[in-house]
Curated annotation (Swiss-Prot):
Domain of life per record: Eukaryota
Gene responsible for this protein: SCPL47
Species assigned in the record: Arabidopsis thaliana
Organism lineage: Eukaryota, Viridiplantae, Streptophyta, Embryophyta, Tracheophyta
Protein name per the record: Serine carboxypeptidase-like 47
Active site: residue positions: S228, D416, H473
One GO MF term attached to the UniProt entry: serine-type carboxypeptidase activity
Function: Probable carboxypeptidase.
Length: 505
């Protein structure tokens, strides 16, 4: 794969040889070199066919090999750095606090976590939002530049204001995590995380340091958001924050809610929806559907074993269950499984190369304080290190949160196959919590944007589900205005079964 290419989410798809590679990575430090070799040609061809093998495996920096940046936070002016022709169009960057920084993780040998922070274009009392991109191992800069960040990237690599950036209604943080993702790095491979305990503890430590650095935001409402594999990260972090607050471990974090977009949260239920969704969208035949039902029985059984015991059986669960997805994709040549309306043209279904080129420019790296570190958009080593986490059910962490009044929004674009709305709606419906019966009997109502139907909404108490029309896996990219209205209404407690006609800009 060429240096400019990468793939955004790398969910679900690999062969048995790819699974066995996880053991070699974790037991062989030589794997943490600038390239990753696979013993099986078939595995490599499969992975490349789905754009799952980034060129750069992970940012593991040998000790003493470069003058790695120390823990810093600095104010940045992206528009000036990019030499943007239209820098004068829109608000002045100087009006807001735009920051980039590193956080030295305390429970690691040498890990540094990179982040961006953008103060609200509206007012500093707006909620604080953290965004987590999935993968696992994909940089949150993907969302920042192509979905809901303050800026978009032009063809000439200049930047321009995003009219529907989430910083219009929130003070927003984008974190490169787990360690080894994006500009985050370590000099010791043992810092690479392999489960949600490690990931959520690192993020909790980061948030403690963030609020210590920015005390004026401590009392603001706080929301956790993200998409795709962040369907694992988000419940784990919400649970960790809630637990830390209860135990008075540090600075109280004013957690009000968490939102999962087209996420992977309960694999056992969601894999069962693949065949039904594919049939509904005419991707497969009735006979294909019947065959997939049998495959799902095996998937369901082994996923239950994974949830009970973890370990190697979870590797096997990924192999067994992803065969369902692979069989569907094989039926439609060139299918973009993140948006089934579109063709996956060329080597990538989406071209996000502008971001990699921009962030690897010398003047940009200098402005961000990242030294000579090469930007890694999606890390195959981080992805592989989390392999035994994939089939774990993170829904189990949610009932105690919503029962305590912490709001949950699950939203999904209707044309995404890989984390489809049907599978997400099923685990939400089946979740055992105090309001399950009330949610089950709640009516669906239209979600309106500018007076037009933009989705279908269901709500009861702290739980909301939203099916977003005319969107795929990345809702803020496909429906930027609707996603901004969704966020604002939800944070204000207005994303309810009573239609909301508009939002304030």
């Amino acid at each position: 794969m060429e240096a400019k290419t990468f793939f955004l989410f790398m969910l679900f798809i690999f062969s048995q040889s790819w699974l066995s590679t996880s053991k070699r990575i974790l037991n062989n430090p030589s794997v943490f070199s600038s390239s990753l070799n696979f013993s099986s040609g078939n595995a490599e061809r499969l992975i490349k066919s789905f754009n799952l093998m980034p060129k750069y495996d992970v940012n593991v920096i040998p000790k003493g090999s470069l003058d790695a940046p120390r823990l810093i936070e600095r104010q940045i002016d992206f528009l000036a750095t990019a030499g943007s022709k239209n820098a004068s169009v829109g608000p002045s960057v100087q009006e807001f606090g735009h920051y980039a920084g590193y956080y030295s993780l305390p429970h690691s040998k040498s890990a540094k976590m990179f982040y961006f922070f953008f103060e609200s274009r509206n007012k500093t009392t707006d909620p604080v939002v953290i965004w987590l991109t999935g993968g696992p191992g994909c940089s949150s800069s993907v969302a920042m530049f192509y979905e809901n960040g303050p800026f978009k990237i032009s063809k000439d690599l200049s930047l321009y204001w995003n009219d529907f950036g989430w910083d219009k209604v929130s003070n927003i943080i984008y974190v490169d995590q787990p360690v080894g993702t994006g500009f985050s790095y370590t000099s010791d491979e043992s810092d690479i995380r392999n489960d949600e305990d490690g990931v959520s503890n690192d993020l909790y430590d980061f948030l403690q340091a963030f609020f210590k650095e920015h005390p004026k935001f401590v009392k603001n409402d706080f929301f956790i958001t993200g998409e795709s594999y962040a369907g694992h990260y988000i419940p784990a972090l919400a649970s960790r924050v809630h637990s830390g607050n209860k135990k008075k471990e540090g600075i109280p974090i004013n957690l009000k809610g968490f939102a999962i977009g087209n996420g992977l949260t309960n694999p056992e239920i969601q894999y069962g929806a693949y065949g039904d969704y594919a049939l509904q969208m005419k991707l497969i035949s009735e006979s294909d559907h019947e065959s997939l039902k049998q495959d799902y029985v095996e998937c369901q059984n082994i996923t239950k074993k994974c949830s009970l015991g973890g370990g190697l059986v979870c590797d096997s669960a990924v192999e067994v269950c992803t065969s369902i997805f692979n069989k569907i994709v094989a039926k439609k040549s060139g299918l973009n499984y993140y948006d089934i309306r579109k063709k996956c043209v060329g080597s990538l279904c989406y071209d996000f190369s502008r971001m990699e080129i921009f962030l690897n420019k010398e003047n940009v790296r200098k402005a961000l304080g990242v030294g000579d570190i090469k930007f890694v958009s999606c890390s195959s080593t981080v992805y592989d290190a989390m392999i035994e986490d994939w089939m774990q059910n993170l829904e189990v962490k949610i009932p105690s949160l919503v029962n305590d009044g912490i709001n949950l929004l699950v939203y999904a674009g209707e044309y995404d196959l890989i984390c489809n709305w049907l599978g997400n709606s099923r685990w939400v419906d089946q979740m055992n919590w105090s309001g399950q019966k009330g949610f089950g009997s709640a009516k669906n109502v239209s979600f309106l944007v500018d007076g037009k139907e933009a989705g279908l909404l269901k709500n009861h108490g702290p739980l909301t589900f939203l099916k977003v029309y005319n969107a795929g896996h990345m809702v803020p990219m496909d429906q930027p205005k609707a996603s901004l209205q969704m966020l604002q209404n939800w944070m204000q407690g207005k994303l309810r079964t009573t239609p909301v006609l508009g939002f304030s800009q």
